[in-house]
Swiss-Prot record:
Residues 308-471, 529-570 form a coiled coil. Residues 110-129, 234-280 are annotated as: Disordered. Belongs to the CCDC22 family. It comes from Drosophila willistoni (Fruit fly). GO terms for biological process: positive regulation of ubiquitin-dependent protein catabolic process. Disulfide bonds: none annotated. This is Coiled-coil domain-containing protein 22 homolog.
Length: 570
């Protein structure tokens, strides 16, 4: 049940954050049970928003709250045994059953309701992003699964494209292993098993069509020795194919005938050569490889030159910055040296102006500083005086407390002296304690003596009972054997059986009387204990309270009657 409890606690924590998920159902208090059940009921039905979520202090109100929650659970469809005791005295098994039912009744569209509630106020960027992610996930979960080789067609149809404009372009370099595994080496087989992409991955890389690619590969394997022909473009639509198959004018028929003758002549010349399409493709691939190598080498050279030019550019820019800074300084010096007397006068005037400005600022600062220093000194003096006054007050309080404590100490000393004089001496106490101990020991010895006597008596009774039983069995056997032949022995046997039954009845009566006397003594002890509890006085107090409450009720009734009479008269 631990996993079930964890699930229940997780759901309750999502509904009400005040319920910790680390709690256990066995440790649920009545207040926590009421809060959890009320939260679940409010989530189930929006009309139950006024349900109490906590238990009041009064016992009557507690019963009312528990009965209301029990009725609401029954109205929700709970068929188990539920009442106020389920909430006030919770049982883990019943509580687990109730919470599981309420969690199953929770609405599944709580998230959509939260989204609808959020539209009433502007959403932040984070909330908008979370909402978009949630909507995207919902849409993806509702979409049906489509195989990998059909996803391109499905995506184009979802965009509104017609099936006639779909391009069935084949993958020309489809890599398919041979059907016979003996034709492949161990390395090739390992490559196809672990690293080689499958047909779906090869065709889905660049939007190739799977069926067209497989048919193209099959044609290459079957008709690879035939001469190459101009392939018909598979991307043409059905209207174009119909237009090509049905010419509209005789000029077109003549041109098509001329083209057919040229094609036949080219086919005748092609049959004379022995080159196959695969060899031509190999040659083209080789030429392309050489061209790519040349282009790569050229690219490396160009990149190296570009890096060198960038380095030169950075160095030139740095040199330019240094030269510009030096040039500015030289220009300033040249301006100063061009008219030395005038510039020196200007500098002296500037120095004098700055000195005058500094003096004025210093004077202003001193004028502003003096009142601040005065206020600071006054505040410090006031603070010190306040602290001194606080210390003096605390000293006076401590002196008063010391005087009061000393007086109390003197009073206690005097009371202690008087108590020691009035109380009995220590020897009297020890004598009384020894007497109590002697009495206790004497009582203990008497109790042990009574117990020993009862044990001895019990042993004697058991021995006598065993002897009587043996004697009865022996006499019973003798009389039974002689009763077969003698009438007097038969009568004696009957009298013996009657005597045995009477004796057993007497023993039972004695044991019953003993039990009754024991119960009587126990009841007497209980009665004495109840007498010590002053039950009569308590009953009298309760009856007095009842009489006072009745009098109060009668007074209220008379007041109500007077008010009614006043209303009727008025």
């Amino acid at each position: 049940m631990d996993e079930v409890d964890k699930i229940i606690m997780h759901q309750l924590h999502q509904i009400d954050a005040s319920i910790e998920p680390t709690e256990e159902l066995a440790n649920f208090t009545p207040a926590l049970v009421v809060r959890a059940v009320a939260s679940c009921l409010q989530e189930i039905s929006q009309s139950l928003k006024d349900l109490p979520r906590s238990l009041p202090m009064a016992m009557a109100q507690r019963f009312n709250v528990a009965t209301i929650l029990a009725e609401r659970c029954q109205e929700s469809g709970y068929r188990g045994d539920i009442g106020y005791q389920t909430f006030l005295y919770p049982n883990p098994v019943e509580l687990r059953r109730l919470l599981m039912f309420l969690i199953e009744q929770l609405p599944r569209e709580r998230q959509s309701e939260d989204d609808a509630n959020r539209t009433s106020h502007p959403l932040s960027s984070r909330e908008q992003l979370e909402r978009q992610i949630r909507q995207k996930l919902k849409a993806q979960l509702k979409m049906p699964w489509v195989p990998q080789f059909c996803r391109m067609v499905a995506n184009r149809k979802s965009l509104g494209c017609n099936s006639q404009c779909i391009s069935f372009e084949p993958q020309l370099n489809l890599n398919v292993p041979s059907a016979n595994p003996e034709d492949r080496s161990k390395e090739v087989q390992q490559y196809f098993d672990q690293q080689a992409p499958n047909l779906f991955q090869q065709t889905s890389a660049n939007c190739y069509d799977l069926i067209a690619s497989v048919m193209h590969k099959n044609d290459l394997e079957r008709w690879g020795d035939l001469p190459s022909m101009d392939p018909v473009t598979l991307t043409s639509t059905s209207d174009d194919l119909v237009g090509k198959a049905l010419p509209t004018s005789p000029t077109q028929t003549s041109t098509t005938a001329e083209k057919a003758a040229q094609d036949n002549s080219s086919e005748a010349t092609a049959t004379s050569t022995t080159t196959t399409p695969l060899e031509l493709l190999g040659q083209e691939v080789q030429e392309l490889r050489t061209q790519t190598e040349i282009m790569l080498n050229h690219r490396k050279m160009v990149t190296s030159k570009l890096n060198e030019l960038k380095i030169r550019e950075t160095t030139a820019s740095q040199e330019k910055e240094t030269i510009e800074s030096k040039l500015k300084s030289h220009e300033k010096l040249s301006l100063v040296l061009s008219e030395p007397e005038e510039n020196v006068g200007k500098l002296e005037a500037l120095v004098e102006a700055t000195e005058n400005k500094r003096q004025t600022l210093n004077q202003q600062w001193q004028d502003y500083r003096r009142p601040l220093l005065d206020t600071l000194s006054t505040l410090r003096n006031a603070q010190e005086a306040q602290q001194v006054q606080i210390i003096r007050n605390s000293i006076e309080k401590l002196e008063q407390e010391i005087i009061a404590k000393s007086q109390q100490h003197n009073e206690l000393n005097s009371s202690l002296k008087n108590a020691t004089q009035s109380v009995a001496p220590r020897q009297e106490y020890t004598r009384r304690i020894h007497e109590f101990i002697k009495n206790i020991r004497k009582q203990r010895e008497d109790i042990f003596k009574v117990l020993d006597d009862t044990r001895q008596l019990q042993k004697q009774l058991n021995v006598v009972n065993a002897q009587l039983q043996r004697q009865f069995n022996y006499t019973d056997d003798l009389l039974f054997q002689s009763a077969k032949h003698d009438l007097h022995a038969k009568k004696a046997y009957k009298l013996l059986a009657q005597l045995h039954s009477n004796c057993s009845e007497l023993v039972e009566c004695v044991s019953l009387t003993g039990n009754v006397t024991k119960e009587i003594r126990d009841l007497e002890v209980q009665i004495d204990g109840e007498k010590l509890k002053n039950v009569l006085s308590r009953l009298q107090q309760i009856t007095g309270d009842i009489q006072r409450s009745e009098q109060h009720i009668q007074e209220l009734q008379t007041q109500i009657r007077q008010v009614e009479n006043a209303i009727t008269v008025g």
